[in-house]
């Protein structure tokens, strides 16, 4: 029989109506001549009542049912008695008296309970992912994701964007992470790469006169995984011609506002706040600031430059900085042992220690209090905004070490003391980025975003011969949500001359630039318009909207932290015949100790 509606959508408006429902048995309660079944589908759960009073045949069927059996029923919707109403259920006002029932399929006992809050391991749930996805909290993630994509399509279509697919088999180019490579059977020894982003193709579309492009782009990066990363992911990718950075940001804000309204019925305030990269680093110690709470970093370098406390004065003398955060009521809530643990933890950022002071009615208290006179105390209090009962935490070192240290402590302590409004969605633009970033691991300068980013107009000369390109700032912008990068973009370079200068500044020879990006450089000779764009991480956006810790929870079939997939056991070895077709020999090397 044809299904009337979803089980989870049956409500009081259906009272007295005959409905046909199909779904899974969530729970069975047998009272002899009365059996209650909770029937579950993707929209929720409804209670079924089986009784010989309604149908003896249906009662016999109910006696056979077990959890996760697939069931079809037809019955009459009835109001529950007042004492039986379940306010915790969306359908708790009604129940369905079953007149006909049919088992569509039986089921083995699942390896874990199909319910929220189940204690099964992540690995087990991923092995039986199709069962895990039956749980309401997992379905919620996929539904939110779907609403986001529907809002994206609707809004960008209204704004005149064309949905255009770009290739998934393309050329390997250095964009930061390792490429996933695909061997070519037709061209032995040659490889395609799965795209890390559609960056160059969407720029070429602007050169083709498309004007406004978007797609929900699948991207692939062979990198170490963490909570907000997967080897394959989806981004909301867009590119426009003839627009300024501010105009692109306005379109993006409209897109985000539509998504928030259509998914969570939240009206976000427009326009979003904007701060420069430098201001973000100065105030928050990070380029991804969480602005839902205060406790900002305060620079006291000038106050302590001549201090008798040599850790502070020495740091300033060596070109470093001294900054502090004031932890509200921290003097009462953090013990010496707690502070020592924090000091030990921040050593990973290069910090050599953590100085601290408690603010009492009598002034500063703590190991370094003796180094500060009354006037210095007053200046530090004024600069940090500290009050009696607060705890001051200090870091003195190079600017990056200080920012990393106090930036981490700021967020960690805000979480510990419940200073963050978890119901707030705080969007922020971080703009005016450096064009280059120094990679301390590789000991070289790299593009802060990517090699195709346009410098600020007044900084273009820094790419000329004899100038210092690392002084340049970029026409780039990141959109931050609750302390995480939601997406980012820039105005792109649109002339060959400037693009070649940029690549040269990154260490590309003319030959290597043409080898890697020759098709783009050639295209730039043919009248490219001013253009720019942005990409937003769809998986991360969905994760933040459903308030989950890992993007796996909003991806139907994700990889685990080892980049494998327990259900299909991918990746796997392939046959010698397949390798021979690809002209490949495999030499599996043991990992280095």
From Swiss-Prot:
Which GO biological process annotations does it have?
A: aspartyl-tRNA aminoacylation
Q: Which GO cellular component terms, listed alphabetically, does the Swiss-Prot or TrEMBL entry include?
A: cytoplasm
What does it catalyze? tRNA(Asp) + L-aspartate + ATP = L-aspartyl-tRNA(Asp) + AMP + diphosphate
Gene of this entry: aspS
Q: What does this protein do?
A: Catalyzes the attachment of L-aspartate to tRNA(Asp) in a two-step reaction: L-aspartate is first activated by ATP to form Asp-AMP and then transferred to the acceptor end of tRNA(Asp).
Protein name per Swiss-Prot or TrEMBL: Aspartate--tRNA ligase
* EC number(s) from the headed UniProt entry: 6.1.1.12
Q: Which residues bind L-aspartate?
A: 175, 221, 449, 492
From what organism does this protein derive?
A: Pediococcus pentosaceus (strain ATCC 25745 / CCUG 21536 / LMG 10740 / 183-1w)
- Tell me which family the UniProt entry assigns to this protein: Belongs to the class-II aminoacyl-tRNA synthetase family. Type 1 subfamily.
Pfam families the record matches: GAD, tRNA-synt_2, tRNA_anti-codon
Q: How does it assemble?
A: Homodimer.
Subcellular location field: Cytoplasm
InterPro entries (alphabetical): Aa-tRNA-synt_II, aa-tRNA-synth_II, aa-tRNA-synth_II/BPL/LPL, Asp-tRNA-ligase_1, Asp-tRNA-ligase_1_N, Asp/Asn-tRNA-synth_IIb, AspRS_core, GAD-like_sf
Instruction: List the residue ranges of the region (Aspartate).
Output: 199-202
Enzyme's top EC category: ligase
UniProt keyword ATP-binding, yes or no: yes
The residues that hold ATP are 221-223, 230, 485, 537-540
| HAMAP family assigned | Asp_tRNA_synth_type1 (MF_00044)
């Amino acid at each position: 029989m044809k299904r009337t509606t979803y089980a989870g959508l049956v409500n009081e408006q259906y009272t007295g109506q005959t409905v046909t429902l199909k779904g899974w048995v969530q729970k069975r309660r047998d009272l002899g001549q009365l059996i209650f079944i909770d029937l579950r589908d993707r929209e929720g759960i409804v209670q079924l009542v089986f009784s010989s009073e309604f149908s003896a045949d249906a009662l016999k069927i109910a006696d056979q049912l077990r959890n996760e059996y697939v069931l079809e029923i037809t019955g009459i919707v009835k109001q529950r008695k007042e004492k039986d109403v379940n306010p915790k259920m969306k359908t708790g006002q009604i129940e369905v008296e079953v007149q006909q029932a049919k088992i569509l399929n039986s089921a083995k006992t699942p390896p874990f309970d199909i319910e929220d809050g189940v204690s099964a391991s992540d690995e087990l749930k991923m092995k039986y992912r199709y069962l895990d996805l039956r749980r309401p909290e997992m379905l919620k993630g996929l539904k939110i994701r779907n609403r986001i994509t529907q809002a994206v399509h609707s809004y960008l279509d209204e704004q005149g964007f064309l949905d255009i697919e770009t290739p998934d088999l393309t050329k390997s180019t250095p964009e930061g992470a390792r490429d996933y490579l695909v061997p070519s059977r037709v061209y032995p020894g040659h490889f395609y790469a799965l795209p890390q982003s559609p960056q160059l193709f969407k720029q070429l579309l602007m050169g083709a006169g498309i004007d406004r492009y978007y797609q929900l782009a699948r991207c692939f990066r062979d990198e170490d995984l963490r909570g907000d990363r997967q080897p394959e992911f989806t981004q909301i990718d867009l590119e426009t011609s003839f627009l300024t950075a501010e105009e692109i940001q306005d379109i993006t804000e409209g897109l985000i506002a539509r998504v928030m309204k259509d998914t969570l019925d939240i009206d976000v305030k427009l326009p979003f706040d904007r701060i420069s990269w430098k201001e973000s680093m100065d105030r928050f110690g990070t380029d991804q600031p969480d602005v839902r709470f205060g406790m900002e970093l305060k620079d006291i370098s000038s106050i302590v430059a001549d201090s008798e406390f040599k850790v502070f004065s020495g740091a300033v003398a060596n070109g470093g900085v001294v900054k502090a955060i004031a932890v509200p009521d921290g003097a009462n809530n953090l013990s010496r042992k707690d502070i020592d643990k924090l000091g030990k933890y921040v050593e990973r950022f290069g910090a050599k220690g953590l100085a601290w002071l408690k603010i009492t009615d009598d002034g500063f208290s703590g190991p370094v209090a003796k180094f500060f006179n009354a006037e210095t105390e007053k200046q530090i209090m004024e600069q940090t905004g500290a009050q009696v009962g607060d705890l001051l935490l200090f870091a003195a070192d190079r600017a990056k070490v200080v920012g990393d240290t106090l930036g981490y402590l700021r967020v960690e302590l805000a979480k510990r003391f419940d200073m963050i409004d978890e119901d707030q969605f705080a969007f922020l633009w971080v703009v005016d980025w450096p064009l280059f970033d120094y990679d301390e691991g590789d000991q070289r300068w790299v593009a802060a975003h990517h090699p195709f980013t346009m410098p600020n107009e007044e900084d273009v000369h820094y790419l000329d011969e004899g100038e210092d390109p690392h002084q340049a700032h970029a026409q780039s912008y990141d959109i931050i949500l609750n302390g995480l990068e939601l997406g980012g973009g820039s105005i792109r370079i649109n002339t060959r001359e400037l693009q070649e200068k940029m690549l040269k500044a990154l260490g590309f020879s003319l030959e290597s630039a043409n080898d890697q990006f020759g098709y783009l450089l050639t295209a730039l000779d043919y009248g490219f318009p001013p253009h720019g764009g942005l990409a937003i991480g769809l998986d991360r956006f969905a994760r933040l909207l459903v308030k989950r810790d890992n993007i796996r929870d909003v991806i139907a079939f994700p990889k685990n932290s080892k980049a494998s997939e327990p259900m299909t056991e991918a990746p796997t070895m392939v046959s010698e015949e397949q390798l021979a077709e690809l002209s490949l020999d495999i030499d599996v090397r043991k990992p280095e100790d």
